[in-house]
Curated annotation (Swiss-Prot):
Residues 1-114, 179-326 are annotated as: Disordered. PROSITE patterns: RRM. This is Transformer-2 protein homolog. Its main location: nucleus. Residues 220-239 have a biased composition (Gly residues). It comes from Dictyostelium discoideum. Sequence-specific RNA-binding protein which participates in the control of pre-mRNA splicing. CDD domains: RRM_TRA2. Residues 38-55, 240-326 have a biased composition (Basic and acidic residues). Disulfide bonds: none annotated. The lineage of its organism: Eukaryota, Amoebozoa, Evosea, Eumycetozoa, Dictyostelia. Residues 104-113 have a biased composition (Polar residues). Residues 56-85 have a biased composition (Low complexity). Belongs to the splicing factor SR family.
Length: 326
């Protein structure tokens, strides 16, 4: 019995060893290689299906039917662009630049005693304005603005009343007044600055053009370009062709007492010789003959007296005699 039981237990063990595991069997049935990892990979959904499930690019709302591109209100129907005035509107109504600014300044100008008169005829003069506006009150003066280049009227001017109330009354009653066939317009001056009859004139310091050389002035004072000074020809630097500051003619006599190129000198006689008032003879003239030169000349004279000039004597002895002498 014991032997039979051992044999039966051995048979069961052998059966267990020989029987394949269920996992490997399934793997062999599915893959044929016994690889369980590939089985799990095959069970995952394929990549191709995931790509097909993603929406195509052609139907993207941001690409094809994007409202920002095709129907963007900022492009086609932008209220900022569509509502801006077009060129036709500018031609029809104007750009509203200087005219609007001028009218706004004129309308906001505070009442004053200066009344501007605009739209005048070219032949209207200052006396005509004074005669026309003097019926409203006393007038200080009238300025008719003239063109500086042509000298003609610019067709507007300013009437200066002594009282501001008279200017206010004249403005109210003289609107659309006919003067020399022109309908004039009156308004208060928009500026407090005085109005000049010829605008454009420069009242400041003189400015020199870089293309022109500045005026030449003497570094020592007055004087024009050709030497005449502020005091009758003796300005700073003196006359260019006459007397200088030291008081003498440049080519004539000197104030120091003598001619520059000859004559006597206050410092002691003739410059080129003669006696010196400071102490007798200066020792000779200025061109080389002083006391030392005189000593050399005396020595040479004594040498000639003793023996003569040997070279001159030999030359006299060797001279050929006259062949024609008999």
């Amino acid at each position: 019995m014991e032997v039979a039981d051992r044999m039966m237990s051995n048979g069961v063990d052998n059966d267990r060893r020989s029987s394949p595991s269920p996992h490997r069997g399934n793997g062999d049935m599915n893959n044929g290689n016994g690889n369980g990892n590939r089985d799990s990979r095959e069970r995952s959904p394929p990549r191709g299906n995931s790509r097909e499930r993603s929406p195509p690019r052609g139907g993207s709302p941001n690409r094809g039917g994007s409202p920002n591109r095709g129907g963007s209100p900022n492009r086609g129907g932008s209220p900022n662009r569509g509502g801006s005035p077009s060129r036709d509107d500018k031609r029809r109504y104007g750009n509203g630049g200087n005219g609007e600014t001028r009218n706004r300044l004129a309308n906001t100008a505070s009442p004053s005693n200066v009344l501007g008169v605009f739209g005048l005829a070219p032949q209207t003069e200052e006396r005509d304005l004074k005669d026309e506006f003097s019926r409203f009150g006393k007038i200080d003066h009238v300025d008719l603005i003239m063109d500086r280049k042509t000298g003609r009227s610019k067709c507007f001017g300013f009437v200066y009343f002594e009282n501001k109330e008279d200017a206010v009354r004249a403005k109210e009653e003289c609107q659309d007044l006919q003067l020399h066939g022109k309908s004039i317009r009156t308004d208060f001056s928009a500026t407090k600055k005085p109005h000049e009859p010829t605008p454009g004139k420069y009242f400041g310091n003189p400015r020199y053009d870089s293309r022109r050389s500045p005026p030449r002035f003497s570094p020592y004072g007055g004087g024009d370009r050709y030497g005449r000074g502020d005091y009758g020809g003796r300005g700073g630097g003196g006359d260019r062709y006459g007397r200088d500051d030291r008081g003498g003619d440049r080519y004539g006599r000197d104030d120091r007492g003598g001619d520059r190129y000859g004559g006597r000198d206050d410092r002691g006689g003739d410059r080129y010789g003669g006696r010196d008032e400071r102490g007798g003879d200066r020792g000779g003239d200025r061109y080389g003959r002083d006391d030392r030169d005189r000593h050399r000349e005396d020595s040479r004279d004594r040498y000639n007296d003793r023996g003569g000039d040997r070279y001159n004597d030999r030359f006299r002895d060797e001279r050929p005699r006259d062949s024609y002498r008999r």
